A protein has these predicted regions:
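Gram-negative (and chloroplast) outer-membrane scaffold detector with strong preference
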Residues: 49-112, 119, 123, 134-140, ...
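A cross-taxa feature marking solvent-exposed loop/turn segments within ectodomains of secreted
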Residues: 22, 39, 87-89, 137, ...
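Sequence/structural signature of outer-membrane beta-barrel proteins
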Residues: 32-38, 63-69, 100-105, 145-153
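Cleavable N-terminal export/targeting peptides
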Residues: 1-24, 167
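A generic hydrophobic-segment detector
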Residues: 122-167
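Membrane-embedded beta-strand positions of outer-membrane beta-barrel proteins
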Residues: 27-33, 58-62, 78, 94-96, ...
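Short glycine/proline- and aromatic-enriched beta-strand/turn motifs that initiate or cap beta-hairpins
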Residues: 20-65, 164-166
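Residues that define the transmembrane beta-barrel architecture of outer-membrane proteins
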Residues: 25-27, 40-44, 72-76, 122-126, ...
Length: 167
């Protein structure tokens, strides 16, 4: 009986390692599209995912939001993800990172109060959020992110959906 229990525990411990993929040092590249509430516009961009360890991922990205009502924006994010596998093909990850955005306004934009106010505003900030990743096939994945960007005068909620490949 004792040997049976030890064998079962050993078998379970060995099979657990198969649930955690070995990603350390791998790089993924993909595209993303989404919506941001403050700019009230759709955006598209690219992202890179670099696994520093099996669970810690560095994710820089660039996104451009199309012009709407005389306003447009582009942004660069440098996020960190802590990937938590929930099944063999699905993972959740909290998001934390830094943000830089460039906001452009036409002269007739509602945000321009007087003629002397600059029409371009640069905003550093912080990102916090949650993401979900689903591995579609070998080296192919889809991801969905919901994050809040803390910016001076322009804080916003942003939803992004992406698609990417691992190398």
């Amino acid at each position: 009986m004792k040997k049976s229990v030890i064998l079962i525990v050993l078998f379970l411990l060995l099979s657990l390692s198969k649930l955690v993929a070995q990603f350390e040092g791998t790089i993924g590249v993909g595209t993303q599209a989404g919506y941001a509430t403050e700019i009230n516009s759709l955006g598209a961009g690219i992202h890179i995912h670099y696994y520093r360890t099996n669970n810690l991922r560095i994710a820089p990205s660039f996104t451009y939001f199309i012009e709407r009502k005389g306003e447009n924006m582009w942004m660069i994010d440098a996020d960190a993800h802590y990937v938590i596998p929930v099944s063999i093909t699905a993972s959740l990850y909290p998001i934390a990172g830094i943000h830089y955005s460039n906001w452009n306004f036409d002269a007739d934009s509602e945000r321009i109060v007087n003629e002397l106010e600059p029409r371009v505003k640069h905003r550093p900030g912080v990102n916090l959020g949650l993401g979900f990743q689903h591995d579609i096939g070998y080296r192919v994945r889809a991801n969905f992110e919901l994050k809040y960007q803390f910016l001076k005068d322009y804080s916003q909620v942003m939803f992004m959906a992406g698609f990417g490949f691992w190398f």
